[in-house]
């Protein structure tokens, strides 16, 4: 399962000529066969994830030195506004709490961290650590 996008018409013609009609591997075929079986469980898991993500983001918004950047991803990007640099915060969380977060200051050209949205217990541990700092 995948996508190829190109403006090169010659390349597209050559690929179409060589590609079988059913361009899918055995894993993809198996996945499509069982997809319906797990549709309800997947929908329930996604609902639970969205609910936990919303709760986590609201709690992060109450931490004075963070500014949450709105998104719909499975992580939360935050600007570290005061007290620490992104790197300092990442190092302290790792050293003092054993929690690993992503320091995005090099890639984002600013003082940013990326926090994974995990389960309620893990998210609560991170929130507790952020509040204590």
Predicted features along the sequence, with ranges:
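Hydrophobic side chains in well-ordered alpha-helices
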Residues: 15, 89, 126-129
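PLP-dependent aminotransferase class I/II
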Residues: 1-62, 67-69
């Amino acid at each position: 399962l995948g996508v190829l996008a190109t403006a090169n018409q010659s390349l597209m013609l050559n690929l179409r000529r060589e590609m079988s009609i059913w361009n899918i591997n055995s894993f993809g075929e198996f996945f499509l066969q069982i997809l319906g079986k797990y549709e309800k469980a997947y929908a329930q898991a996604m609902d639970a994830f969205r609910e936990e993500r919303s709760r986590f983001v609201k709690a992060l918004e109450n931490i004075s030195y963070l500014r949450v950047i709105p998104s719909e991803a499975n992580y939360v990007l935050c600007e570290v506004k005061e007290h620490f640099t992104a790197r300092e915060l990442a190092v302290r969380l790792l050293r003092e709490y054993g929690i690993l977060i992503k320091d995005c200051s090099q890639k984002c050209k600013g003082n940013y961290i990326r926090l994974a949205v995990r389960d309620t217990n893990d998210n609560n541990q991170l929130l507790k650590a952020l509040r204590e700092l």
